[in-house]
């Protein structure tokens, strides 16, 4: 279906002049970024005119917009266009949130509805073992007598699963161990044996269970930096360790230094560890294990508020996992590998492109565009003379593009309040429009244009600029090529370049007998034509496209 375009309304008047000036400035800015050859000093664009001959438009198809048209630009605010801001979303992020919802519900149950049963068991065990924990351990010779201090109260409070309001950053906060929750004896022997490096394998002492005894609680309670990506590691490590039964343990590579006071360590050594583990030996025996394993918070006395880089944590985690795997701790190795994989997936998902929501009213029109008009582009180039020395003097050359021939396929998409426009490459245009019909098979090109052979020749890299005696340069086809000599394979014709012909007029110095006074003007013309073609193909041909607000 042919479409008549009111060319005069679009190109004349104040709006048409402003559009012409903007196109001129755009082409000039592009020439300033082009690396110039040695014999050209500079290129300046002075004027652009649309001409009086309009292009011919033929509607070929109406389809759904290309996916790239829905891609979000982080520098653009779409709130003015969309009535519902939440329509803009990331599909991958939605899936990750839906997958993480069971883990979040498990965390809520730990401190919510499931807390009642667990607390009943915990209270019974704590009440029966309070004497052994608080008073049963014989004091060490020379140690001060134990008195009910604030730290002892905190330890007993933590054993009952309660939250002491005065210390919300301790890694022992909200301790919950499998031995206590299952109704058995306390697993402080696990804790002490692991810190004393007794050599228990991962099958006897689950890594996540030991980590849970040290950390306890979700990340927002134990001083770790809580992020949305913790749910993926939670599921991987819980499946690898099988020691927490979904108690909401969340390891994290990016973490801040835990705050542990000497009073807490002293109380733990006197009450919870049998009275023979001092803070110094506690740090010496467990420093390497606690510092390097990704599932355990660091207890080393570092400055508060600092954090280790995630890259360094990931490297040390992988190296530690390999060492532990050689020593027989298979669960640690699998947990480290799972955490490393989740870390990579999360970094990829954060950089994943966001797309806008599709609507049923979005549409795209495919046009075939023919143009053989008198568009004008005026520019000057300073060429350098190398005599008597290199770059001795610069002479301005006036170049005028007086017309061009174009044949291609364009795409116009309307999405909300934006219009996207681009041309298709010859290969994409052939796929979008289809092969030649039987009626047009005998014509010069796919669309029945007898100048298709010249178009294909002009698109090749061997095209050159031929200068006539009148000073008009055009893109000529290479030797042996003739109009209408398109390449045909299997009955399908191949489209040529979009810009089939560019007419250039050059003026320099004084003319004698209709000849140019300088020989390298042809090189300047060839360079200008090649750059015009390159700018057009890079800026207007898909996947590059232009967006207009309507």
UniProtKB/Swiss-Prot annotation:
Q: Which PROSITE patterns match?
A: SMP
Q: Where is the SMP-LTD domain?
A: 1-550
Going by the UniProt record, its keywords in alphabetical order are: Endoplasmic reticulum, Lipid transport, Lipid-binding, Membrane, Mitochondrion, Mitochondrion outer membrane, Transport
In which broad location class does this protein mainly occur, judging by the first location in its UniProt entry? mitochondrion
Biased composition (Acidic residues) is annotated at 69-90
Q: Where in the cell is it found?
A: Mitochondrion outer membrane; Endoplasmic reticulum membrane
The membrane topology of this protein is: Peripheral membrane protein
Question: What residue spans carry the Polar residues bias annotation?
Answer: 148-157, 251-269, 278-289, 296-323
UniProt superkingdom: Eukaryota
Under the GO molecular function aspect, what terms does this record hold? lipid binding
> What GO CC terms are in its UniProt record?
endoplasmic reticulum membrane; ERMES complex
Q: Does the keyword Membrane apply?
A: yes
Task: State where composition is biased (Low complexity).
Answer: 125-140
A Pfam family in this protein? MMM1
What InterPro entries does its record include?
Mdm12, MMM1_dom, SMP_LBD
Residue segments, region Disordered: 62-168, 218-356, 474-493
The GO biological-process annotations, alphabetized, read as: mitochondrial genome maintenance; mitochondrion-endoplasmic reticulum membrane tethering; phospholipid transport; protein insertion into mitochondrial outer membrane
* The record's note on its domains: The SMP-LTD domain is a barrel-like domain that can bind various types of glycerophospholipids in its interior and mediate their transfer between two adjacent bilayers.
Q: Its function?
A: Component of the ERMES/MDM complex, which serves as a molecular tether to connect the endoplasmic reticulum (ER) and mitochondria. Components of this complex are involved in the control of mitochondrial shape and protein biogenesis, and function in nonvesicular lipid trafficking between the ER and mitochondria. MDM12 is required for the interaction of the ER-resident membrane protein MMM1 and the outer mitochondrial membrane-resident beta-barrel protein MDM10.
Q: How does it assemble?
A: Component of the ER-mitochondria encounter structure (ERMES) or MDM complex, composed of MMM1, MDM10, MDM12 and MDM34. A MMM1 homodimer associates with one molecule of MDM12 on each side in a pairwise head-to-tail manner, and the SMP-LTD domains of MMM1 and MDM12 generate a continuous hydrophobic tunnel for phospholipid trafficking.
Q: Which family does it belong to?
A: Belongs to the MDM12 family.
Q: What is this protein called?
A: Mitochondrial distribution and morphology protein 12
Q: Which species does the entry assign this protein to?
A: Pyricularia oryzae (strain 70-15 / ATCC MYA-4617 / FGSC 8958) (Rice blast fungus)
Taxonomic lineage from the root: Eukaryota, Fungi, Dikarya, Ascomycota, Pezizomycotina
């Amino acid at each position: 279906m042919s479409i008549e375009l009111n060319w005069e309304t679009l190109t004349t008047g104040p709006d048409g002049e402003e559009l012409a000036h903007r196109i001129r400035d755009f082409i000039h800015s592009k020439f300033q970024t082009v690396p110039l050859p040695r014999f050209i000093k500079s290129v300046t664009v002075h004027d652009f005119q649309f001409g009086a001959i309009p292009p011919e438009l033929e509607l070929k198809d109406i389809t759904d917009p290309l996916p790239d048209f829905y891609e979000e630009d982080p520098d653009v605010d779409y709130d003015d266009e969309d009535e519902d801001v939440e329509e803009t979303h990331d599909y991958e992020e939605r899936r990750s949130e839906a997958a993480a919802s069971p883990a979040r519900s498990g965390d809520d149950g730990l401190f919510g509805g499931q807390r009642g049963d667990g607390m009943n068991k915990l209270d019974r065990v704590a009440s029966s073992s309070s004497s052994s924990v608080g008073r049963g351990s014989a004091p060490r010779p020379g140690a001060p007598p134990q008195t009910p201090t604030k730290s002892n109260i905190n330890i007993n409070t933590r054993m009952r699963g309660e939250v002491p309001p005065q210390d919300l950053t301790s890694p022992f906060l909200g301790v919950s161990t499998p031995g206590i929750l299952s109704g058995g004896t306390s697993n402080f022997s696990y804790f002490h044996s692991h810190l004393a490096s007794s050599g228990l394998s991962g099958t006897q002492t689950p890594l996540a269970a030991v980590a849970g005894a040290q950390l306890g609680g979700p990340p927002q309670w134990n001083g770790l930096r809580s992020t949305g990506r913790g749910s993926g590691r939670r599921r991987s490590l819980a499946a690898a360790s099988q020691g927490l039964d979904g108690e909401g343990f969340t390891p994290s590579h990016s973490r801040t230094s835990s705050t542990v006071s000497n009073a807490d360590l002293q109380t733990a050594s006197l009450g919870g560890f049998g009275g023979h583990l001092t803070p110094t030996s506690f740090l010496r025996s467990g420093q390497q294990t606690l510092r390097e394993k990704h599932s355990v918070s660091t207890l080393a006395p570092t400055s508060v508020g600092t954090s280790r880089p995630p890259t360094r944590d990931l490297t040390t985690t992988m190296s530690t996992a390999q060492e532990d795997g050689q020593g027989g701790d298979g669960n640690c190795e699998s947990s480290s590998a799972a955490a490393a994989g989740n870390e990579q997936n999360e970094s990829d998902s954060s950089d994943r492109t966001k797309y806008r929501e599709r609507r049923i009213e979005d549409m795209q029109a495919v046009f075939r565009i023919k143009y053989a008009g008198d568009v004008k582009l005026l520019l000057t180039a300073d060429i350098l003379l190398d005599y008597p020395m290199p770059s001795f003097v610069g002479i301005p050359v006036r170049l005028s593009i007086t017309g061009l021939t174009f044949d291609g396929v364009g795409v116009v998409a309307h999405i909300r309040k934006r219009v996207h426009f681009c041309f298709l490459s010859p290969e994409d245009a052939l796929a979008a429009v289809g092969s030649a019909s039987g009626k047009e098979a005998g014509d010069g090109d796919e669309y029945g244009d007898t100048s298709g052979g010249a178009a294909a020749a002009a698109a090749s890299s061997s095209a050159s600029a031929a200068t006539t005696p009148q000073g008009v340069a055009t893109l000529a086809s290479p030797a042996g090529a003739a109009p209408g000599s398109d390449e045909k394979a299997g009955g399908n014709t191949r489209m040529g370049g979009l810009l089939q012909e560019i007419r250039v007029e050059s003026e320099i110095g004084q003319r004698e007998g209709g000849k140019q006074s300088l020989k390298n003007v042809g090189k300047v013309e060839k360079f200008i034509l090649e750059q015009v073609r390159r700018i057009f193909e890079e800026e207007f041909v898909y996947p590059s496209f232009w967006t207009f607000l309507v």
